Amino acid sequence: MTEPAIITNASDPAVQRIIDVTKHSRASIKTTLIEDTEPLMECIRAGVQFIEVYGSSGTPLDPALLDLCRQREIPVRLIDVSIVNQLFKAERKAKVFGIARVPRPARLADIAERGGDVVVLDGVKIVGNIGAIVRTSLALGAAGIVLVDSDLATIADRRLLRASRGYVFSLPVVLADREEAVSFLRDNDIALMVLDTDGDLGVKDLGDRADRMALVFGSEKGGPSGLFQEASAGTVSIPMLSSTESLNVSVSVGIALHERSARNFAVRRAAAQA
């Protein structure tokens, strides 16, 4: 097995490319930095196109990552640890990372083509929560996620890539406004169910329904907006002790999707066999 070459010169074009990608003020985001072995491998499997993958010269690269890069013909090089330290002066120093081309943004039509339930996050802004919800939604068979008023300019945001462990490109995650989201759900006959503290239904009731749903979750402070409340086919609550004010939104999504998982898994199996 040939060892990756080591970049020892800070003037190497790859070093400047990394500097450019990590600038916070970029007007146009066409490439992004993806850090750590697991997110890199997940993004590669999801079909994200990588320009190159890098490792710090002081840390061995995972053989599984090297094999995957070789299979997909992705160049791999090491960077001298002193240069890595300069590249990531004021932030967490990545030991392995890659420069990737940002995929085409997912569209609502991409979600429509899939049969699973839709997760709508209305005003959820904490990136760590969004990342956890991405992973849970993928694991429990959701068709995709619609982010409304998330304050994210792109799903290629490095914070979201970290929080989702790279899974953000493995299912459609769409940025939309409230009107677009409601129109999309109506046009595709997807029943809109709002999670609320005083719901008409209990979360267990979700498992009894065979129709496709959009599960709407608001922020822990504000809850879902009036537009989603008005458009809803019903409201759903998660039983909990009265001494607990609320659940973390990522936990609520996990509970609701677990109740819907049998239905969503069946849809996924049927699509795979078609």
Swiss-Prot record:
MF GO annotations: 23S rRNA (adenosine(1067)-2'-O)-methyltransferase activity; RNA binding
Coiled coil feature spans: none
Alphabetically ordered keywords of this record: Antibiotic resistance, Methyltransferase, S-adenosyl-L-methionine, Transferase
Resulting phenotype, D36A: Significantly decreases activity
EC number(s) from the headed UniProt entry: 2.1.1.230
Xref: NCBIfam families: nosihep_NshR, NshR_TsnR
Annotated protein name in UniProt: 23S rRNA (adenosine(1067)-2'-O)-methyltransferase
Annotated source species: Streptomyces actuosus
